[in-house]
């Protein structure tokens, strides 16, 4: 997993981590008993189960290594009402059921503190169409799109969005079911692939340029990461995210200080527009004219060895164990 990172990766224009929050990173100097019994929820039944298992096991080990009474809880095998026997929840349940407001609503009903966003932001964030409609209504730049159906006029979609374009399931994460479409003839097949993952499918204008991700923790934008897939004509797909080792991650990201600050501010505005809380990630593109375009939000980001949140935290001087403690501490 090639990665460009220097010890001075912190952008001086970015919002700094405050002294008291930085001190929270000294996880091992604190009393782990303050958290009580912690359920680390991961696995589940969604198409992102494999990623959730990887993320959740990493988080579980990081918490347990610091003396926290943390236990794996898998909704696929356990009755979710049993969560009432815990004091708080670290949610690493990617995809439907864990990232779309369902788990958040249950935990609210049980009165359990939980990491991350609540019902509203989770439900909106898991719906790419609703997210983009909201951002557009707030005056935030997001790539043009159209909702597809079996009876869609494919030629009209191409006339409107141009080629290439990208087709996505509206309610999936981890780039599952996504396809780049280069010709009109490829569009129906891409629709079928995406429709096989869910009930709603969208096409989005292809933005030629550089891809970035912006990690947000405690309403602070961390150093921007530039993503460079080995195949620069393609996109940051599932294979590049989790299985390949030739994707490059650049910190510093190569933007000027002014551009990075602008992208961080845009991402914070997008994060707050959907009422997201705690931690998350915004994906964006910069086109060849230098304009930034919001793609989507992730309210339960990956925490695997390939994941972007740990990379951004590392650029802030925070190791993985400290990061997990810090996120869990948001529930206190």
UniProtKB/Swiss-Prot annotation:
Domain of life, per lineage: Bacteria
Catalytic activity entry: 2 D-alanine + ATP = D-alanyl-D-alanine + ADP + phosphate + H(+)
Q: Can you cite a GO biological process for this protein?
A: cell wall organization
**Cell location:** Cytoplasm
Disulfide bond annotation, renumbered to this chain: none
**So, what pathway does this thing act in?**
Cell wall biogenesis; peptidoglycan biosynthesis
Domain ATP-grasp intervals? 132-329
Instruction: Kindly list the positions annotated as binding Mg(2+) 1.
Output: 283, 296
- What is the E.C. number? 6.3.2.4
Q: What does this protein do?
A: Cell wall formation.
Name of the protein this chain belongs to? D-alanine--D-alanine ligase
């Amino acid at each position: 997993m090639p990665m460009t990172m220097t010890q001075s990766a912190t952008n001086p224009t970015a919002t700094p981590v405050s002294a008291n929050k930085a001190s929270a990173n000294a996880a091992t100097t604190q009393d782990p008993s303050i958290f009580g019994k912690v359920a680390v929820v991961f696995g589940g039944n969604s198409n992102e189960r494999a990623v959730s298992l990887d993320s959740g096991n990493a988080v579980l080990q990081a918490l347990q290594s610091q003396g926290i009474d943390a236990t794996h809880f898998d909704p696929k095998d356990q009755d979710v009402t049993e969560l009432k026997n815990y004091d708080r929840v670290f949610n690493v349940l990617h995809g439907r059921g864990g990232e779309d407001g369902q788990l958040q609503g249950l935990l609210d009903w049980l009165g359990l503190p939980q990491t991350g966003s609540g019902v509203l932001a989770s439900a909106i964030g898991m719906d790419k169409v609703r997210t983009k409609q909201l951002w557009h209504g707030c005056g935030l730049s997001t790539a043009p799109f159209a909702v597809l159906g079996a009876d869609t006029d494919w030629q009209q979609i191409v006339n409107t969005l141009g080629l290439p374009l990208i087709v996505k399931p509206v309610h999936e994460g981890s780039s599952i079911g996504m396809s780049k479409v280069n010709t009109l003839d490829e569009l129906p097949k891409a629709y079928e692939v995406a429709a096989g993952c869910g009930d709603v499918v969208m096409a989005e204008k292809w933005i030629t340029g550089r891809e970035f991700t912006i990690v947000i923790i405690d309403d602070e934008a961390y150093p921007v990461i530039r993503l460079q897939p080995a195949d620069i004509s393609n996109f940051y797909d599932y294979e590049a995210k989790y299985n390949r080792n030739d994707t490059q991650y650049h910190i510093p990201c190569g933007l000027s200080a002014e551009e990075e600050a602008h992208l961080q501010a845009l991402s914070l505005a997008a994060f707050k527009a959907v009422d997201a809380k705690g931690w998350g990630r915004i994906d964006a593109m910069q086109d060849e004219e230098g304009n930034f375009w919001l793609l989507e939000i992730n309210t339960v980001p990956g925490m695997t060895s390939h994941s972007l949140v740990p990379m951004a935290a590392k650029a802030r001087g925070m190791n993985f164990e400290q990061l997990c403690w810090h996120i869990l501490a948001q529930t206190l």
